[in-house]
UniProtKB/Swiss-Prot annotation:
The gene is chiA. Keywords: Carbohydrate metabolism, Chitin degradation, Chitin-binding, Disulfide bond, Glycosidase, Hydrolase, Multifunctional enzyme, Periplasm, Polysaccharide degradation, Repeat, Signal. SUPFAM superfamilies: (Trans)glycosidases (SSF51445), Carbohydrate binding domain (SSF51055). Residues 1-24 form the signal peptide. It comes from Escherichia coli (strain K12). It comes from the Bacteria. Disulfide bonds join C628-C673. Residues 25-91, 128-194, 229-295, 337-403, 459-529 form the Chitin-binding type-3 domain. Residues 198-216, 309-318 have a biased composition (Pro residues). Bifunctional enzyme with lysozyme/chitinase activity. Its EC number is 3.2.1.14, 3.2.1.17. This is Probable bifunctional chitinase/lysozyme. Gene3D superfamilies: Carbohydrate-binding module superfamily 5/12, Glycosidases. Belongs to the glycosyl hydrolase 18 family. Chitinase class II subfamily.
Length: 897
């Protein structure tokens, strides 16, 4: 079986056989910059949500912390910790429990200056050169005074490695290691910050991105060789422009204001983002114009918007007319509008506030209010775009004050074990809300916890060949230890494997001297008394069986069940997402939308402009592996997600969505929810509150072989289907599975066989026709030969045979109608696999011939040209090979009722 190691919200959704991760993983080491990092800290993997500073520590990050960009993704595996290291402290970066972490020959540069801890060896494909006042956004490895340095972000020629200090936010050079004798010999080893050769005066700096000082920069724009050139006319925003000014072409390196003039830009000017690129051609000047003055802007102030500070007490109401307002130069028609409601994140938002439309120029916090903003206010990222139309105010609303209404959302107090709670009390515990169904005494159940009594079993001697899982106890030399997670061959008696406080990634918790009882002590243990307050590790007897208390406990017997259940506050959600106007089509093109990306397309605009009316939203997963709480990608709650306005607008336009639960990464609800009834209720509530007609379960990665979650899911789906039937509701269920050209894997067939055995009625089986990892599907540089398309149609043909065997009473047409195919457009995760437009045409022909139930793609955000590598935001082909939404143009006609 192939295991998927990709995060679907970052790249794709297919099974991977032999591919590198989308993000290079490393131990946390004070990373700084606008790049996307994936780091290991204290046994967990974190990713930065926006620009990160070296002083931001993952260990201090919280789920919605606007001051810390690190976000917890999952627990690191033992292999990852072994390979990349495991930083344990915010105070000393680079400390690792792994002996395999890279350590430099010296942690002190040759010049004796302070240095950042080593960041590993120089990659084999990177050359080491002498420091020569390099400038730009590319990555250099330079020799200076006997040491090798690497720039952590955009570097200026005035930045000298000799001046760099640990965590220095003003100097991007970071010490890597001591230089070798060969490197010193070949580079001449510059030793002075003033003696390096001066860069040629006629060479202008490369148009690289440098963060503006003292502000959170917007996500780096991706430049394209085929950029559009326009005349400078006071452009404003975070889009990337190439403008003509006084015979030269300039590009903005970060957010640019209308008052920033290219003519005022200097080489290292941190106050002006314009950077010289090259001389404009005569044709470009003739075609686009050539403004030469900073004081005279053509075309009515050059199209620049002069910010207005409307008075909140007197809301601005535009005069209705039949004309649409002029669109700002940096507007993106494929992204949607919404009322301001305290949006937070690095996504680009277009919001309505007090009669106007605003757009954030960089990362925005929930406390940043559009009122009073201006281009000169570097502390507030909101920028006025235009006046909202009457239709927009009617559709999206018009907040006029900076007070954020929580929409009736319940705010719960933190759980206290020493406190008693009445029935229906709601508490907050580990960033989740729980509600108790009965009165709860002090020192009772902990929300989300197991019964505090554990059946007594003499701890067995530890064995190196035995696999231990969480909760298993062993004895070594008279000392007891408890496994904190899966472990094998890790001797608990070794300090290197011990985790006394739960603060590192080691597997064993020391418990002290092993408890052992004689038969007489066990038989004469005191009988359980609910009125007694028991200390932890107390032996009792209950119904003839001995138990040990795992915590302080009272009025809870070993047979009681935990009355606390995860509580999701769905207040107002049904209204936020709107109601579909039409039935879900029997044959539909429903591309996947990574609904946790920073740049989610405007679904209504796609319906209007590209005839794509149905989408599959991905992915709802558990908050973490141990918390039975649905979230969007672990990052966003279900109740008041800011992106719901996109669903409502799509439904108003006549389209609809289905939702996908699961994915390759993070824990599915079926894994974290051990109680089938709890799992069933979550499925019911998701469908009910998001007004869904179709629900998809994406089962892949390790979860396609996890029997416990497979069985829980199928049992819960059967239960919720029975409930829907009793209420007269017809909700379609699809299972999405990985596939090979030869058909489903044995694990995938097991999922379907178990579903059938438990009575689950599937509307369809969608397969991920991508990332096969098979030599016959290698298709790079074979455009037009339809290699990847043939692998997809072969997979569908073999799936048909497998489903026919599972459902012998269904006709061929019925089997075809319950199949779906979802390729990954463009460059796939598996190296050498590429899905071209010609492949799409072949897949479309096969889908129409068979009359399949569904066609999808991973993903709609990737249906854009750009780059040559993997990305969540483009397909890796040129615009000549596949223009914007070219794959959707092929597949969109597939939809029919």
């Amino acid at each position: 079986m192939k295991l998927n190691i990709f995060t679907k919200s970052m790249i794709g959704m297919g099974l991977v056989c032999s591919a590198l991760p989308a993000l290079a993983m490393e131990a946390w080491n004070n990373q700084q910059g606008g790049n996307k990092y994936q780091v290991i800290f204290d046994g967990k993997i974190y990713e930065n949500a926006w620009w990160v500073s070296s002083t931001n520590c993952p260990g201090k990050a919280k789920a919605n912390d606007a001051t810390n960009p690190w976000r917890l993704k999952r627990t690191a595996t033992a292999a990852e910790i072994s390979q990349f290291g495991n930083t344990l402290s915010c105070e000393k970066s680079g400390s690792s429990s792994s002996s395999n972490s890279n350590t430099p020959a010296s942690n002190t540069p040759a010049n004796g200056g302070s240095a950042t801890p080593a960041q590993g060896t120089v990659p084999s494909n990177s050359s080491v050169v002498a420091w020569n006042k390099q400038q730009g956004g590319q990555t250099w490895y330079v020799v200076f005074n006997g040491a090798v340095y690497k720039n952590a972000w955009w570097v200026a020629s005035s930045n000298c490695p000799g001046d760099a200090k640990s965590n220095d936010a003003s100097n991007p050079w970071r010490y890597v290691r001591a230089a070798t004798a060969t490197e010193i010999s070949e580079t001449s080893n510059p030793q002075s910050c003033t003696s390096a050769p001066q860069p040629s005066p006629d060479v202008k700096p490369a148009p690289d991105v440098k963060p503006a000082p003292d502000v959170q920069p917007a996500p780096a724009d991706k430049s394209n060789d085929n950029y559009a050139v326009v005349a400078w006319k006071g452009q404003e925003g975070s889009s990337t422009w190439y403008v003509i000014y006084n015979g030269g072409i300039y590009k903005n390196a970060w957010w640019v204001g209308a008052a920033n003039c290219p003519g005022d830009a200097k080489e290292n000017d941190a106050s002006n983002p314009w950077r010289y690129v090259r001389a404009a051609t005569a044709t470009e000047i003739s075609q686009y114009g050539n403004p030469g003055s900073c004081s005279v802007k053509p075309d009515n102030n050059g199209g620049a918007v002069t910010p207005v500070d409307p008075t909140p007490e007197t809301p601005v109401t535009p005069t209705p007319d039949n004309s649409e307002p002029s669109t700002p130069a940096d507007s993106v028609n494929d992204y949607s509008l919404q009322a301001w409601s305290g949006q937070e994140g690095s996504e680009i938002y277009h919001v309505i506030f007090n009669g106007n439309v605003y757009k954030n120029a960089w990362w925005v916090g929930s406390k940043d209010c559009p009122r009073g903003t201006s281009a000169e206010n570097s502390n507030n990222p909101w920028r006025l775009e235009r006046t909202a139309t009457a239709a927009e105010l009617s559709q999206y609303g018009n907040p006029t004050t900076c007070e954020i209404d929580n929409g009736g959302v319940i705010v719960a107090d933190g759980f206290q074990a020493s406190k008693a709670y009445s029935a229906d009390s709601i508490v907050d515990y580990n960033d989740a809300h729980y509600k108790t169904s009965v009165d709860q005494d002090a020192w009772g159940f902990v929300p989300g916890g197991d019964n505090p009594w554990k059946k007594y079993e003499p701890a067995k001697a530890w064995s190196a060949s035995t696999v231990y899982v969480k909760g298993d106890r062993v004895v070594v030399d008279g000392q007891a230890y408890e496994a904190l997670f899966w472990t094998q061959s890790d001797n608990p008696a070794l300090v290197a494997n011990q985790n006394a406080t739960g603060s590192n990634s080691r597997p064993w918790k020391p418990l002290g001297k092993a408890q052992s009882y004689s038969n007489e002590e066990l038989n004469n243990a005191p009988q359980f008394n609910p009125e007694t307050l028991y200390a932890s590790d107390t032996l009792i007897r209950f119904n003839g069986v001995n138990y040990i208390s795992q915590s302080k406990v009272q009025k809870v017997s070993p047979s009681d069940s935990n009355p606390w259940r995860v509580f999701v506050d769905w207040t107002g959600t049904k209204e936020r997402v709107g109601t579909p106007k039409k039935a879900w089509p029997k044959h539909v093109y429903a591309p996947y939308v990574d609904f946790t990306l920073n740049t989610i397309p405007d679904l209504a605009a796609l319906a209007k402009n590209h005839n794509v009316n149905h989408f599959t939203l991905a992915f709802v997963v558990s908050k973490d592996a141990n918390t039975c709480l649905p979230t969007w990608g672990t990052a966003y709650g279900m109740q008041n997600y800011a992106q719901y306005s996109k669903i409502k607008a799509l439904r108003e336009a006549g389209g609809d969505v289905m939702l996908s639960i699961g994915g390759a990464n993070n824990a599915p609800l079926a894994a974290s929810c051990k109680n089938v009834d709890d799992l069933m209720q979550h499925y019911y509530d998701i469908v009910d509150n998001l007004n869904l007609k179709v629900l998809d379960f994406d089962i892949e990665g390790t979860w396609v072989a996890d029997q416990a979650s497979i069985e829980r899911r199928n049992l819960a789906v059967k239960k919720v289907q029975d409930k829907w039937k009793s209420e007269g509701k017809d909700i379609a269920i699809w299972y999405t599975l990985p596939i090979l050209p030869t058909g489903l894997t044995p694990e995938g067939m097991n999922v379907l066989s178990d579903a059938k055995a438990k009575g689950v009625e599937l509307a369809g089986v969608n397969v991920m026709t991508m990332d096969y990892g098979n030599a016959i599907c290698q298709s790079a540089n074979t455009e037009g030969q339809n290699i990847h398309g043939k692998c997809a149609t072969s997979a569908i043909a073999n799936l048909h045979s497998q489903l026919k065997g599972l459902h012998p009473n269904k006709s061929d047409a019925e089997i075809d109608a319950m199949m779906g195919t979802t390729p990954m457009v463009g460059v796939n995760d598996v190296q050498g696999e590429v899905f071209y437009l010609s492949d799409a045409r072949l897949v479309m022909q096969d889908a129409q011939k068979r009359n399949l139930g569904m066609v999808g793609i991973w993903s709609i955000a990737r249906d854009l040209p750009g780059g040559t590598n993997l990305s969540p935001e483009f397909h890796g082909l040129t615009k000549e090979q596949a223009p914007k939404y070219a794959f959707s143009e092929i597949f969109a006609p597939f939809t029919k009722q």
